[in-house]
Amino acid sequence: MDIHRCRFIDYTPSAITAMAFSHKSGQNDSMPNNLLLAVGRASGNIEIWNPRNDWCLKTVLYGGVDRSIEGIVWSTGEEELRLFSIGFSTTITEWNLHTGKPLVNQDSNAGAIWSIAICDETKTLAVGCDDGSCVLFDISGGPGVIEFKRVLMRQTSRILSLDFQTKDHLVGGCADGVIKVWDLSTPNSAIISRMQVDRARKGEAALIWAVKSLRDGTIVSADSSGAVKFWNGKFFTLSQSFKLHLADALCLGVSANGDMVFSSGIDRKTIQYSREGGKREWVSNSFRRFHSHDVRCMAVFECKSLDVLISGGMDMMLAVIPVRQFNRKNHRMISAVPQRPRMAVAPKARLFMLWNDHEVLLWRIGSPGYRFLLKIVLADEENISHAAISPDGELIAISSVLRTKLYQLQYSDENVKVETVEDSFLSNIGASLLSFTVDKNKLILVSNDSEIFLIELSRLDSRQLEVFELSQPTSKKIAPRQRSNVSSMCDGICSIAVSSDGDYFAVADTVGNIFCYSLSNLTYSELPRVNTYVRAMAFRPDVRGRLAVATAGNQVYEFDVQSRKLSEWSKNNSTNMPKEFSQLLDKAFGAFFDSKHPSRFWIWSANWVSFFDLNLQLPAPRAAGKRKIEMNATVDGNLNDKKLANANSNGISNYGTGDSRCFWITHKYRPMLLVGSVGNSELLVVERPIADMLMSKSMPASFYEHKFGS
């Protein structure tokens, strides 16, 4: 099989700018069923991660132009989770976690907001502004209600960081090098303490980038001089000071019981401070470097079964670090490439497409190279949520959270002519997923609240396209927007697949529900539920009505759509996955079948590509040996027996030889944006090496420490 290995795509994700866990830590507490991590990026998008199943991305809340996320807080209630964000504007945004849209935008009635904090006990939201105002809002009215409460005693400097010490004391770190404490119990919310930090370099006032309050009342600050200071929370006096950072300390993390503090910043060091055995004094135990550029934010969560420190910054990757074994256990870096692919392939036309923020780019796979064809730039403020291209490349659909646009393409030897298909329905509905049928006569649209629409495209010249709203499952399992239960939030449709014969399409959600629709009579059938998040699925081209599914638990299932049961292959093999596959940390990003071997179910992720032959039985489980990866591994040409021999020496594992190979996996290609079939016996592999991302023009230089003699 020939592989087109592509590395020229200039795709660089946005920096991570803010993050927060949905629940407060408790070392002796059980893990909440609905524990989530919100990660904000400079593009304005917010990613919602599930710590279960080795950190799966549940959904993305899409932002827009000049809406960088600079602060995130959660309000945790018995009936709902509420998510609030700020972004260098005068607006506080509350997000609808069911639809992914902003629920309400509340103006601060002050300057641009730089910091945000929340007190769940009193349902009070506090924001700090660049004009020195600190504004309180009441959120006790429920989702969508943010009511102005009052403005605290004014001061003149920008408020860079906020945290509630108690329900009556609010701590703010300011741009004049002073930590201020407001007493909210007094009528005028007076400032009861001012704590001055040391001046930064060149005599300038230090910028206090982060403040945190511990359970015993201790206040911790991090500032632009690189200092981390511990303050007595009762008398508001300095207890201890550490100046271990070589540049600005930007963020702080605190353990559940307040016995550990972590700091990081521009110098990339993550430093651990601890107070052990009931001692009053803090000590700096150790430091490690996990990131290659500035660390902008961190969050800590601890419970009985989980203790993690998550950090992120300019290098776009999430670091997952053990809290209690900080300097003893290995950390994990979650790849910067998007877990929901931002690329698609049109196999008949040998085209592939990339979308990002507000633009879509299109290339043709030629012989011997690639040819850039088209760039579509949207005038909308909202970021692109999804896009799709028809198999013959003549139609492209692009969607945001508010609207969908359809384009018709005509190709000539030198140019591509683009015409916009105007339609009032598409102009007023956003989509989370889009897919064309094989004959391009229908567009399947999944709305932000998991409604499914079928748009008839056979008569594009008509004034109004024919639209069918498909019936929803009666159990409402796949339409969680109707329910108020916390556990249903973000559990919308996450995957879609269309059969190559045009008879069926299937949708699946993040809790394992799978529904298959008939394109002829638009009825649906419910398939057996899998036990975890459906990551990718595809229909077999050689057997009618067979759907293969890859889950977040690293399991592969095959369903017979007509009987609504597992196939014989799945009954025999789904619980017998090879260790090389079942123990993978990176979950599947996509799946497909190739035309030369139509029974081979290809699955790929950021750092691996594999296939299962669904006509062959897997052998009995065997222990997974240590995988050795050589950079000169040669599997980018023909996948023949000679190149697949000696599996462990080149990062490849396979069961069987030739056409009798029932399983194969390689770790050579990394990290990947797309893997897809582009013709008979041809694969397209699009890589975006991390080194190329970090050297892109948009990436600032990392901190450099000049040493004597260097």
From Swiss-Prot:
GO terms for biological process: maturation of SSU-rRNA from tricistronic rRNA transcript (SSU-rRNA, 5.8S rRNA, LSU-rRNA). The keyword Ubl conjugation does not apply. WD repeats lie at residues 11-59, 64-105, 108-147, 154-192, 199-241, 290-327, 328-365, 488-527, 529-569. One of its GO terms (molecular function) is snoRNA binding. GO terms for cellular component: 90S preribosome; mitotic spindle; nucleus; small-subunit processome; t-UTP complex. It comes from the Eukaryota. It is found in: Nucleus, Nucleolus. InterPro entries: Quino_amine_DH_bsu, UTP4, WD40/YVTN_repeat-like_dom_sf, WD40_repeat_CS, WD40_repeat_dom_sf, WD40_rpt. Keywords: Nucleus, Repeat, Ribonucleoprotein, Ribosome biogenesis, rRNA processing, Transcription, WD repeat. Involved in nucleolar processing of pre-18S ribosomal RNA. Required for optimal pre-ribosomal RNA transcription by RNA polymerase I together with a subset of U3 proteins required for transcription (t-UTPs). Component of the ribosomal small subunit (SSU) processome. This is U3 small nucleolar RNA-associated protein 4. The gene is utp4.
